[in-house]
């Protein structure tokens, strides 16, 4: 599988690289992020006090979300497989303490509730780069560049990826409700993924990509 750089023109329809974010805004987050654990598998913390409490976190959040309430969390671990793809109603921002790889596709490539994994592209994100992932971009937990794993800040509007609301039991069957999973989280699963076994909507067809061997 070819791995592009987020600096390549191929990334432009998936997101933006914010090269001009002052280091005084990113360095405190990176220092705190570097101290978070890197487990086997992957772990996601939606709202992490150790990141949200650093100097000027409020300024970084305002820069990204323009005054909307936001959350700074992290996704760390070891992973090489696609498994699922998700999207939100707003952009997501990532910042890695280590290099990492994003597997992405476009929402408009979904046809009749299905997406062929042949559409998925891989992009390497250098450590220390702020990357905006558009709300029209399907994504999921990162993949690792090496055996050291990944440590990635995940910034989103507050409440995103939160518990599934009780109101979801009465959600109308319309639009993209078929793949709704949690608060502001819509997910397409591969049949071979753990989330599919939990009842997630199986919407990825084709190979469950693995960057270690594909």
PLM regions and their residue ranges:
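Active-site region of the double-stranded beta-helix
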Residues: 1-127, 138-214
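Aromatic-residue-lined binding/catalytic grooves and analogous aromatic/hydrophobic interfacial grooves
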Residues: 133
């Amino acid at each position: 599988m070819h791995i592009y750089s987020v600096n390549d023109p191929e990334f432009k329809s998936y997101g933006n690289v914010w090269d001009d974010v002052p280091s005084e805004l990113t360095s405190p987050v990176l220092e705190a992020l570097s101290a978070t654990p890197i487990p086997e598998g992957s772990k996601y913390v939606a709202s992490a006090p150790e990141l949200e409490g650093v100097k000027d976190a409020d300024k970084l959040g305002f820069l990204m979300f323009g005054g909307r309430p936001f959350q700074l969390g992290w996704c760390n671990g070891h992973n090489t497989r696609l498994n699922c793809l998700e999207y939100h109603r707003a952009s997501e921002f990532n910042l890695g303490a280590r290099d990492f790889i994003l597997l992405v596709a476009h929402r408009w490539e979904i046809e009749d509730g299905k997406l062929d994994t042949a559409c998925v592209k891989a992009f390497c994100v250098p450590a220390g780069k702020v990357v905006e992932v558009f709300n029209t971009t399907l994504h999921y937990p990162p993949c690792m560049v090496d055996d050291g794993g990944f440590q990635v800040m995940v910034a989103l509007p507050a409440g995103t990826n939160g518990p599934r609301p009780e109101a979801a039991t009465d959600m109308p069957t319309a639009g993209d409700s078929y793949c709704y999973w949690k608060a502001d989280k819509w997910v397409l699963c591969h049949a071979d993924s753990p989330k599919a076994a939990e009842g997630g909507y199986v919407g990825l067809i084709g190979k469950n990509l693995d960057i270690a061997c594909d």
